[in-house]
Amino acid sequence: MKLWGGRFEKDTDREMRDFHASIHFDWRLYEEDIRGSIAHVTMLARQGIITNEEKEKIIGALTEILEEIKAGKVDFSPEAEDIHLNIETLLIKKIGDVGKKVHTGRSRNDQVALDTRLYVKKEGTAIIALIKELQETLINLAEGHLNTIMPGYTHLQRAQPVTLAHHLLAYFWMFDRDRSRFYDCLKRADRSPLGAGALAGTTLPLDREFVSELLGFNGVCENSLDAVSDRDYILEFLFAAATTMMHLSRFSEEIVLWNSKEFSFVEIDDRYATGSSMMPQKKNPDAAELIRGKTGRVYGNLMAVLTMMKGLPLAYNKDMQEDKEPLFDTVDTLKGSLRVFTGMLKTIKFNQGAMYKAALKGFLNATDLAEYLVEKGVPFREAHRITGELVLKAEKTGRELLELSLDELKEMSPLIEEDIYEKLKIENVLAKRKLFGGPAPQAVIEQLRQAREALA
């Protein structure tokens, strides 16, 4: 049943109909669409545009349709194009001409903007909860590894010692920014576009503020043209999702590396690993690899909508139909990735011995030797050179700095004393880094307190 055909003399070409239809993906908005229609007719009755009896009849039928869809009893039709017209068609079949009044004072342009705003608010709230669960997992793990020493890396080369707790909390703060971005995105999505009509509102005495309050919005869109043509709230949502996936991907990359025999820092639980169809010994980190791989599709979704929007004149254009599949796919991908990653992290085993052994190799205490010389009055650049030459000497003879004799150290600088051996022990090197935000256990305890506070 076509609800817009009055000015057309010819039927829509079948291929055009299928090409034009969006019901195969926008059916997911059925709940938001029905919520919006119930609020809309409630307002129409309050304004005297329809009767209370008509309102009750429409709301009763819409409620039935909602339950039928949830029960899987509705077959959506491409003939009705999209979720809006499918539901309206079902409504008219149930209650006849009264159902034709549901769209009074409304366009699909403001209707779809409403539906997607409600959807973004709902899914954004769910994603915020999933990010928070991941953050809580990171805090719990960090509390158990305050004294687990491991190498910190730059350029994937061992650099300076940190604790596993400090490393985990680095991701906590990344995800905290992600959570904040979603909150911020939802603030701007929290405006009702209903009443904007196709682009220029309507002559009917609608009460936009009343509908906005019924639907739980914080206000109404200020400009009718902007209300129907704005997709910033989707773009911001996609950007927040892409950034979150990027952080998940970075952590996943580390887990893939740490899980290898070359590192042996972690063992992934069997529930989050898979085997090889040919090599019986394999235990592959597929959960982490898939999250790393799926990040690209979320980036692609963001770029698709940015590119789609870049050349559109005001107001609504059919191009905007192409915003939904990237949005839906991003929601599914991000929620799935967060659930799987959190589950993997809750069950992962850290090899503290391997981490500690790695921290003892690779001259992670070299910076401390340079700073030891600085404290004795040596200019930093000179101290840097002296330490570099000592590293080279040790490296050529297969030793660490602590394995050089005091005489060998003094050859490079007579200022080096016996106390250097105690100062360069990895535990002492770490303990001295107690500045705010540093990796010393003392500093990390304070960081944990702040992390708990951030989640409160």
Swiss-Prot record:
InterPro entries from the xrefs?
Arg_succ_lyase_C (IPR029419), Argininosuccinate_lyase (IPR009049), Fumarase/histidase_N (IPR024083), Fumarate_lyase_CS (IPR020557), Fumarate_lyase_fam (IPR000362), Fumarate_lyase_N (IPR022761), L-Aspartase-like (IPR008948)
Q: Any coiled-coil ranges, and where?
A: none
Query: Any idea what this protein is called?
Result: Argininosuccinate lyase
Where located? Answer: Cytoplasm
Q: Which GO terms describe its molecular function?
A: argininosuccinate lyase activity
Species name: Carboxydothermus hydrogenoformans (strain ATCC BAA-161 / DSM 6008 / Z-2901)
Q: In which pathway does it act?
A: Amino-acid biosynthesis; L-arginine biosynthesis; L-arginine from L-ornithine and carbamoyl phosphate: step 3/3
The enzyme's E.C. designation: 4.3.2.1
Its GO biological process terms?
arginine biosynthetic process via ornithine; L-arginine biosynthetic process
Superkingdom, according to UniProt?
Bacteria
Principal place of residence: cytoplasm
Q: Which PROSITE patterns match?
A: FUMARATE_LYASES
Pfam families to which the protein is assigned, alphabetical: ASL_C2, Lyase_1
Family, as annotated: Belongs to the lyase 1 family. Argininosuccinate lyase subfamily.
SUPFAM superfamilies, per this entry? L-aspartase-like (SSF48557)
> Would you name any one GO CC term?
cytosol
What's in the keyword line of the UniProt record?
A: Amino-acid biosynthesis, Arginine biosynthesis, Cytoplasm, Lyase
The reactions it catalyses are: 2-(N(omega)-L-arginino)succinate = fumarate + L-arginine
